[in-house]
Amino acid sequence: MIINHNLMANNALRNMNVNSNNASKAMEKLSSGLRINRAGDDAAGLAISEKMRGQINGLNQASSNAQDSISLIQTAEGALNETHSILQRMRTLAVQSSNDTNTTTDRSAIQDEVNQLTDEIDRIANTTEFNTQKLLDGSKVGLVDAKDADASVQLNTSANISLASNFSTTSATGIADSFTVTITRTHGTAGATFASTDYDVALVGGTELIEHSSSSLTYDTKAINLVGMIKCFSIRTNDTIRKVSHVRTVKALSMQIGAIVTNMLIGINSMKATDIGVRNTSGKALDISTASKATGAITQINNAIETVSTQRSKLGAYQNRLEHTINNLGTSSENLTSAESRIRDVDMASEMSEYSKNNILSQTAQAMLAQANQQTQ
């Protein structure tokens, strides 16, 4: 007979505690709805689900960012819609002024309206903003101009049509074998490239000086056969091609549309009257005081309408892309949420069954403990 230990009571007590703890854990899971409430429940599962939660939160915020970006684009596009309406009105006035049935007084009145409309274009460009950020004043173009860059080319010709070069910029000097000449204009770039490696000469955008069906050029003692038309720039000796006398650094809008690092740059050109071509550099609006000037103004206004249309098309493309981005982010977030749920969320039916089992076992163990304590040792 054993008198120091009641083994049956100890066994019943141990099982009762185990079942009670299991029932308590099951109740915690049922009350929280989570299978993992602490790292001890599933250490690996907790680590995986936390990474997923971070990505899900990032995707949801990226979707919100994309929505904000669309709102910004809609703000800019709405302002440009009004700019378009103003330009259409200005074109109508220019067409009206080009008719000689109008007197000088009539054209003066028309000019006054054109002046006011031009001022309104500038006001829209200077005041349109989203969350205090200017959108149409040229501060969101995303381009950087060079600083004080002078490019000089010296062309010497002889009977053999030979070419000598002396080219320098702030970044490169003394280019002996090859060089590239670039002329930057308001709406584009025309370039001429000379290369000594294969001795091809490509000249684009210059003034036509020579035209032959075929000719021969000598460059560095090697012959170049050109068939067709030869075009080159009309450049005086040591003529300066381009000089940029200022620095203008502007920044495009960077949109964070991904959970990690996915930036989208949105550039918006200046929509000021001068930049779209309906105000000259001296600050005067288009002159429609005569029929001939009004006719010329129509062409300038047409170009301005095309410029604004191009910018609105870009904004529309940005918006369409962002809408697809939002759809993709939503799908990704939904799939990751489903995966995270399978790891972390509790199966209510299964856990309820587990709780009922452990609760019954705990009650049974408690009853058996009472019986064991009454047994003869």
UniProtKB/Swiss-Prot annotation:
Underlying gene: fla
Subcellular location: Secreted; Bacterial flagellum
Protein's name according to its UniProt entry: Flagellin
Coiled coil: none
Keyword Secreted: yes
InterPro entries reported in the protein's UniProt record: Flagellin, Flagellin_C, Flagellin_C_sub2, Flagellin_N
Pfam family for this entry, one: Flagellin_C
SUPFAM superfamilies assigned to the protein according to its UniProt record, in alphabetical order: Phase 1 flagellin (SSF64518)
Lineage: Bacteria, Bacillati, Bacillota, Clostridia, Eubacteriales
PANTHER family reported for this sequence: FLAGELLIN
